[in-house]
Amino acid sequence: KNYFTGDLLWVPIKPPGYWQFTLDEVQIGPYQMKLKTGTAIADTGTSLIIGPTKEVSMLIQSLNMTDADKNEYDEFVKPCEDVEKLPPLSFKIQGRMFPLKASDYFLPTGDGDCLLGVTANEGMDIAGVSLWLLGDVFLSKYFSVWDVANKRLGLATAVPKPPEHEMHRWHESESSTGAKQGANLARPPLTATRRDSQR
């Protein structure tokens, strides 16, 4: 409980072999994207959020971004000072909204610009299915419990990582509880259960 706030939402995964579950809706600000067959995969091996080409294009348009906002690597960027003005991006899972602030889904590049942490899965679109890969951009915001035995994923808002000067207290607490704290580096294998808290 020291690692998250509120209650865990337990989401059944399907089919066995993937951390895949039903996604009800994606929302950017007040705009809702209704998904006929919404599916999400929690993927710690993916850095960004990857979505269907059509929906990601709609998201980019709602952020008033055009090709003029692309850098030399064909990535969408905005000045970091403008990011806070942008709307939240939310994923609705089993009736509960999991929002990301703009500062969560835009990533600083170190030169004053912030990179959009959502990209399209061009060439991977599946007809009739709205498939989203929720990588580190999403998982770094939410505490996750990977329950292999019961084929379910637990999600709750993660407690922010303490400042550097308080990290020793954090690690002492970790040792006493036996819970693992830190960034996910890989999906847990299907033969074991792993419990991870994010940043």
Segments and roles (model prediction):
Residues 1-199:
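Active-site or ligand-binding cleft "flap/edge" segments
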